C-alpha cells in the first residue's frame, strides 16, 4: 500500500516536470514574439514525451578520464533528493507527517549541493568544475537567508510541522504580515534553484552549460528533471509558507486545487522573470546576499522573536 502512495506522489511530479519544460518554452516563445514548440502533437503538447524518448534512448557517453562511480551517482542522487523533498509537503495531507518537516526539507536541500559538486569534479573538465563551484557557493550562501527566513516564519507559526501553517493562515496569509520576508524568500528560492537571473552556473558565454557540460542522454535528463522538480517544490513550499489555503476536512480536494493554482502562478512568475531579466554578475550576486539580505533577515528575525513575546499577554480572540 505504501508503494502505491509513493508512486501516486512521484508520477504526478514527473508529469508536472515534463509539462513544465513545455510551458517554459511556450511562455518564453510568446514573450519573444514567436510560437515555441508546435510541431509534435496538437499545439506541441507531445513535445515533452518526444524529448524524453530521445534522451533516454540515446547512448550515455562519458569522458574517458572521468571518475565512473561519482559520475553515475551524482545525477541519481540529484533526482532522488528532488523527489524526497516532496514527502513532508501537506497537500493537504503529507505522505509522511513529520514533526520536523521544515528541518527535513532544509537538510535535503543542503544535501543537493553534493550532487552538483560531484558531477563537476567527476567530469574532469575545467568548465564543469568552475560551474559546480559557482553553483555550490551560490546555493550555500542563499541557504543562510532561507534558513533565517524559515525560522522567522516558524516563530510566528509556533511549530516546525508544515501542516500547522494551514491553521495559522486561516484568517490572514503570512505574505501580508511578513511581506519583506516573502519577497526575500522568493528571490532566494530563485538563487537556490539556479534560475535566471541567478543562473551563473550555466553562463553560455564562459561555461558552455555549467556543471552538467559532460553529461548526455539519461544522466543529463535526470539532472534536468531534478532542477525542474526543485523549482516546482520550492514554489509549492512558498505557497504553503506565505499563501496558505484554507482547509476544510470534508472537502480536501478544494485545498488541493487552491494549492496547485497558487504553485502554478508562482512557477509562471519564475518563467516570466527568466524572460525579463539579464544575468547577474557574480560579485553582484554575493553582494545582494551578504550585504543586503542577511542584515535585513537578521533584523526581521529579531522582530519575529520579540513579537510573540510582546503579544503573549493578550488573551486569544475567539
Swiss-Prot record:
Q: Which GO terms describe its biological process?
A: aerobic respiration; mitochondrial electron transport, NADH to ubiquinone; mitochondrial respiratory chain complex I assembly
What topology in the membrane does the UniProt record assign? Multi-pass membrane protein
InterPro entries per UniProt: NADH_UbQ_OxRdtase_su1/FPO, NADH_UbQ_OxRdtase_su1_CS
Function of the molecule: Core subunit of the mitochondrial membrane respiratory chain NADH dehydrogenase (Complex I) which catalyzes electron transfer from NADH through the respiratory chain, using ubiquinone as an electron acceptor. Essential for the catalytic activity and assembly of complex I.
- Give the main EC class: translocase
**PANTHER family annotated for this entry?**
NADH DEHYDROGENASE SUBUNIT 1, NADH-UBIQUINONE OXIDOREDUCTASE CHAIN 1
Q: Which PROSITE patterns does the entry link to?
A: COMPLEX1_ND1_1, COMPLEX1_ND1_2
TM ranges: 2-22, 68-88, 100-120, 146-166, 171-191, 223-243, 253-273, 294-314
Its name, as the record gives it, is NADH-ubiquinone oxidoreductase chain 1
**Which family does the UniProt entry place this protein in?**
Belongs to the complex I subunit 1 family.
What's an example GO cellular component term for this entry? Answer: mitochondrial inner membrane
Catalytic function, reaction form: a ubiquinone + NADH + 5 H(+)(in) = a ubiquinol + NAD(+) + 4 H(+)(out)
Question: Mainly resides where?
Answer: mitochondrion
Q: Which Enzyme Commission numbers does its entry carry?
A: 7.1.1.2
Specify the domain of life of the species encoding this protein. Answer: Eukaryota
Amino acid at each position: 500500500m505504501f508503494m502505491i502512495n509513493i508512486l501516486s506522489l512521484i508520477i504526478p511530479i514527473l508529469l508536472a516536470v515534463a509539462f513544465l519544460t513545455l510551458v517554459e518554452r511556450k511562455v518564453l516563445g510568446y514573450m519573444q514574439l514567436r510560437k515555441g514548440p508546435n510541431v509534435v502533437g496538437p499545439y506541441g503538447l507531445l513535445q515533452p514525451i518526444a524529448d524524453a524518448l530521445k534522451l533516454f534512448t540515446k547512448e550515455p557517453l562519458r569522458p574517458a578520464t572521468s571518475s565512473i562511480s561519482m559520475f553515475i551517482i551524482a545525477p541519481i542522487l540529484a533526482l532522488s533528493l528532488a523527489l524526497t523533498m516532496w514527502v513532508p509537503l501537506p497537500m493537504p495531507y503529507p505522505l509522511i507527517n513529520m514533526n520536523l518537516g521544515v528541518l527535513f526539507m532544509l537538510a535535503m536541500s543542503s544535501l543537493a549541493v553534493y550532487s552538483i559538486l560531484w558531477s563537476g569534479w567527476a567530469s574532469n573538465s575545467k568548465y564543469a568544475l568552475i560551474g559546480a563551484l559557482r553553483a555550490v557557493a551560490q546555493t550555500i550562501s542563499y541557504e543562510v537567508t532561507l534558513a533565517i527566513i524559515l525560522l522567522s516564519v516558524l516563530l510566528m507559526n509556533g511549530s516546525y510541522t508544515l501542516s500547522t501553517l494551514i491553521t495559522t493562515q486561516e484568517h490572514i496569509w503570512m505574505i501580508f504580515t511578513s511581506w519583506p520576508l516573502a519577497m526575500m524568500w522568493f528571490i532566494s528560492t530563485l538563487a537556490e534553484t539556479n534560475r535566471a537571473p541567478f543562473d551563473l552556473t550555466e553562463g553560455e558565454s564562459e561555461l558552455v552549460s555549467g556543471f552538467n557540460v559532460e553529461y548526455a542522454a539519461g544522466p543529463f535528463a535526470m539532472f534536468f528533471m531534478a532542477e525542474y522538480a526543485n523549482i516546482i517544490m520550492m514554489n509549492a513550499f512558498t505557497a504553503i509558507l506565505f499563501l496558505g489555503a484554507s482547509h476544510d476536512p470534508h472537502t480536501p480536494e478544494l485545498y488541493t486545487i487552491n494549492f496547485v493554482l497558487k504553485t502554478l502562478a508562482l512557477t509562471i512568475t519564475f518563467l516570466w522573470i527568466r524572460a525579463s531579466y539579464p544575468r547577474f554578475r557574480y560579485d553582484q550576486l554575493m553582494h545582494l546576499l551578504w550585504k543586503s539580505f542577511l542584515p535585513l533577515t537578521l533584523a526581521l528575525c529579531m522582530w519575529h522573536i520579540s513579537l510573540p513575546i510582546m503579544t503573549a499577554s493578550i488573551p486569544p480572540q475567539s
